[in-house]
Amino acid sequence: MNIIQSGITAENSSIAIIIARFNEFINKNLLLGALDTLKRIGQVHEENILKIYVPGTYEIPTIASYIAKSGKYDAIIAIGTIIKGQTDHFKYIANDTSSSLSRISAQYFLPITLGILTTKNIEQSIERSGTKMGNKGSDAALAALEMINVMKKLKKVIYY
């Protein structure tokens, strides 16, 4: 029986982070968590990290598709915050964004991890961006690091 498991060090990897500017004060903390994890735990060199800012979370998939198609990056981390308002608009944004990112990831065989918060209120967003509930940007970075290594090991098994 073959088993593929992997670590979280990926020092020679290139990672793109797409950050929504909408709800920037929360997304800034998610980004800081992701960057800290990539550099400190993953040993990723700063020059191998590309940060791209977009207007909102809904715009992230367009850029993710462009990056994925380039073949230059080992993973993408999506960072954004969607907070429920008075209408169901946030559901459509959240569903469309996550579905699109999942489709792009599968189409290009590229890990795309979600550091996107979908919360009922601003307090929940703050809690998940570095206070009580940890930092979901950091969690997304950890997932990206592990997936990079899993994909590298899987390619060796499949292609060699």
Swiss-Prot record:
A GO term for molecular function: 6,7-dimethyl-8-ribityllumazine synthase activity
Pfam family, one: DMRL_synthase
Pathway field: Cofactor biosynthesis; riboflavin biosynthesis; riboflavin from 2-hydroxy-3-oxobutyl phosphate and 5-amino-6-(D-ribitylamino)uracil: step 1/2
Family (UniProt): Belongs to the DMRL synthase family.
InterPro entries reported in the protein's UniProt record: LS (IPR034964), LS/RS (IPR002180), LS/RS_sf (IPR036467)
Catalytic activity: (2S)-2-hydroxy-3-oxobutyl phosphate + 5-amino-6-(D-ribitylamino)uracil = 6,7-dimethyl-8-(1-D-ribityl)lumazine + phosphate + 2 H2O + H(+)
Entry superkingdom: Bacteria
Physiological role: Catalyzes the formation of 6,7-dimethyl-8-ribityllumazine by condensation of 5-amino-6-(D-ribitylamino)uracil with 3,4-dihydroxy-2-butanone 4-phosphate. This is the penultimate step in the biosynthesis of riboflavin.
Amino-acid positions noted as binding (2S)-2-hydroxy-3-oxobutyl phosphate in the UniProt annotation, renumbered to this chain: Q86, T87, R128
Recorded GO CC terms: cytosol; riboflavin synthase complex
Active site (UniProt): H89 (proton donor)
E.C. number(s) listed in UniProt: 2.5.1.78
Name this polypeptide is given: 6,7-dimethyl-8-ribityllumazine synthase
Record-annotated disulphide pairs: none
Assembly and interaction partners: Forms an icosahedral capsid composed of 60 subunits, arranged as a dodecamer of pentamers.
Annotated transmembrane regions: none
Keywords: Riboflavin biosynthesis, Transferase
GO biological process: riboflavin biosynthetic process
Residues binding 5-amino-6-(D-ribitylamino)uracil, per UniProt: F22, T57, Y58, E59, T81, I82, I83, L114
Enzyme type, top EC level: transferase
